[in-house]
From Swiss-Prot:
It comes from the Bacteria. Transmembrane segments: none annotated. GO terms for biological process: regulation of translation. May serve a regulatory role in expression of downstream gene argF; in an argL-argF-lacZ fusion mutation of the start codon to a stop codon in argL increases expression of beta-galactosidase. Induction: Expressed in equally in both exponential and stationary phase in rich medium (at protein level). Disulfide bonds: none annotated. This gene lies upstream of and overlaps argL on the same strand in another reading frame. Pfam families: ArgL-like. The lineage of its organism: Bacteria, Pseudomonadati, Pseudomonadota, Gammaproteobacteria, Enterobacterales. This is Putative translational regulatory protein ArgL. It comes from Escherichia coli (strain K12).
């Protein structure tokens, strides 16, 4: 269970990084 949640968190963090590269304005509004 902990490993699964860790993978989900890691994927979400990497997804946020890609989103910032694509559209930083959108991520600034969300975060």
């Amino acid at each position: 269970m902990n490993n699964y949640t860790y993978k989900v968190n890691f994927n979400s963090i990497s997804g946020v990084r890609h989103a910032r590269i694509k559209c930083p304005i959108y991520t600034k509004n969300t975060f």
